[in-house]
A protein has these predicted regions:
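C-terminal regions of RecA-like/P-loop NTPase motor modules
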Residues: 1-22, 32, 238-356
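The Walker A/P-loop phosphate-binding site
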Residues: 2-109, 124-132
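Charged, alpha-helix-enriched surfaces in structured cytosolic catalytic cores
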Residues: 5, 30, 34, 38, ...
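Catalytic P-loop NTPase motifs of RecA-like helicase/translocase cores
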Residues: 95, 155-156, 207-208
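A glycine-rich helix N-cap at a beta->alpha junction
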Residues: 108-121, 227
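Phosphate-binding/switch loop-helix module in NTP-utilizing enzymes
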Residues: 118-193
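Phosphate-binding/switch region of NTP-binding enzymes
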Residues: 173-294
């Protein structure tokens, strides 16, 4: 009779022989809110989660679509509220301290380190040196850290610089996509078993394929494969006043967000998030439309209706729902999350224990 396989012995052997080997599962334990409940849900499957540490997330979109607002503003603010240290790498030379303060970001170096870089190699070296020091720390001393690169599209390769100095503008001939892919791939491997995450913004360009109208992300597809979450964003004009009435002038933008890739929820779902110039993003923006599309809210005349599990009927006009009148959306989110979790638990075997 063959001897049973000694897993513990094998684990000890490979742990000793392979430096930096991580064994077991690395499920995210820390999540950072995007500042919008609907977007959080489409990314992570939970209204209060959002972007995880230990993974790479990319927000890609055209200029002015709200990428920096969400990544360099909302994510940084919520990370700081959770005690997560933020390293903000500004490649566009566009993030002013006054603008960050207006979004509620604490720019003190004890909570935020802002670096201005232009070279892909410099960004890679910075992250690599940080991770060497990070791994040398005792487990109890390791902080939770979020890297934000705003943006990948503006990063340069040494070839770009050399050609520019020589007056040669033919471009890097495909070196940049390879360098970006290498950067993201290395980050994925370095961050996997640690409470360190990367969020990056990137640019998009119009698709030339009539059968695939979605905008294409610049820099190739390599880093898209390596990323855990990819959100595509498009800029639309917001022509509404504070009460939601239609007006002629533009008072903000509507960020149309489409989840191109996620490992925590159903992909290719979309939401429109309103960002007025005067008041900023509401955490409830787009949530009413999302719940109606999912079938949770039913239309009755000019009202939207939600029936709770206890038979209570929550009914209000659309503007009442969008304004979260009397906390009506909070009630729905609380129960809707429970329904989603119960569906997940029902598809497991009776002997399995479902944990969050």
């Amino acid at each position: 009779m063959a001897k049973p396989f000694d897993v513990s012995k094998f684990r000890k052997e490979i742990t000793k022989s392979i430096e930096g080997l991580s064994i077991g599962y690395n499920d995210p334990t820390d999540w950072i809110s995007t500042g919008n409940y609907g977007l959080n849900y489409l990314i992570s499957g939970d209204f209060n989660k959002g972007v995880p540490l230990g993974k790479v997330t990319v927000f890609a979109g055209e200029s002015g679509s709200g990428k920096s607002f969400i990544c360099s503003g909302n994510l940084v603010r919520h990370a700081q509220q959770q005690g997560i240290y933020v390293v903000l790498i500004d490649t566009e030379n566009a993030l002013d301290e006054k603008w960050l303060h207006a979004l509620g970001v604490d720019t003190d170096e004890s909570k935020l380190l802002k670096l201005n870089m232009a070279m892909i190699d410099d960004v890679g070296k910075t992250i690599s040196e940080f991770m060497k020091s990070y791994k040398a720390m005792a487990d109890t001393d390791r902080p939770k850290v979020l890297f934000i690169i705003d943006s990948l599209g503006m990063l340069l390769t040494p070839t770009d610089v050399n050609q520019f100095e020589a007056g040669d503008m033919k471009g890097d001939m495909g070196r940049k996509p390879k360098a970006l892919t290498a950067l993201v791939r290395n980050c994925v491997n370095m961050f996997g078993s640690h409470n360190v995450g990367l969020v990056a913004t990137n640019h998009t360009y119009a698709s030339q394929d009539m059968f695939d109208p979605d905008d294409k992300i610049s820099g190739g597809q390599g880093f898209v494969y390596a990323s855990s979450i990819v959100v595509a964003m498009k800029k639309l004009k917001l022509k509404e006043d504070e009460d939601g009435n239609k007006v002629a002038e533009v008072n903000g933008i509507r960020a149309a967000c489409k989840i191109m890739k996620t490992r925590y929820a159903k992909p290719f779902e979309s939401i429109q998030v309103k960002i007025p110039y005067e008041t900023g993003m509401s955490p409830y923006s787009g949530l009413t439309d999302m719940l109606e599309k999912s079938g949770a809210l039913k239309k009755e005349g000019n009202s939207l209706v939600y029936t709770t599990e206890d038979g209570e009927i929550l009914k209000a006009f659309r503007k009442g729902w969008e304004a979260n009148k009397d906390g009506i959306l909070d009630k729905v989110m609380l129960e809707y999350s429970g329904k989603t979790k119960s569906v997940i638990s029902n598809v497991t075997t009776p002997t399995e224990e479902v944990t969050e």
